[in-house]
Amino acid sequence: MTTSTPTTSISSDLRPTVRNIDEARNMCHDFASVLTVGPERHEVSDFGHPDHKIVSFDDITVSYAGYRAPTFDHVREIVTWGQGRSNLLVHCHAGMSRSTSSAWGIAIANGFDPQEAYDLLRNNHPIERHRTWNPRPDATTIMRQRAFIPNELVLKHLEKFLGLRSGTLREIAANGSAIAPLDR
């Protein structure tokens, strides 16, 4: 994995925060703006946030009957709405795919270098407690970062929308996809 040292003078307030739907529900009022990517309006109607954008589509990379794949128009709507917003919370259901790719595109639109934006978002991704499978009561618990797996179709649309070479974001994601356990 390639990890860059942040070199930008761009305000860290312009780096979106990524969470899952349950975390977003609990902390949405700590943020100036909230972007829901994926879940339907009825799933987040209890947020009650005054600056809340909802863009609904399924977490798929090809079209299937009965499912909505992310489109170029979805991506344009996400980035256009999110660009320039400081203290932005971006979430989907699991906080792993639609939200990570959307936040990444917004960070790039805010002036972050694609690799730097990826590294910053990934390094600030939530830590989760995982219990290893063990039938005994002394099972081992490890801490590791939540999976950070940007939706490839969203990335493809982002590359086009942001004027990047085709494959740029998908290559960065493919080269930085390994997640190691933390020493905690």
Model-predicted segments: where are they?
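Recognition helices and adjacent regulatory flanks at domain boundaries
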Residues: 76, 93-96, 118-121
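PTP/DSP superfamily signal
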Residues: 2, 80-87, 105-184
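Glycine-rich, flexible N-terminal cofactor/catalytic loop recognition
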Residues: 2-55
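A phosphate-binding catalytic loop at a beta-strand-loop-alpha-helix junction
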Residues: 88-104
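Helix-loop module immediately N-terminal to the HCX5R catalytic loop
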Residues: 53-90
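Short, solvent-exposed loop/turn segments at secondary-structure junctions
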Residues: 39-42, 59-60, 95-97
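A structural signal for well-ordered alpha-helical scaffolds and beta->alpha junctions
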Residues: 34, 71, 75, 147, ...
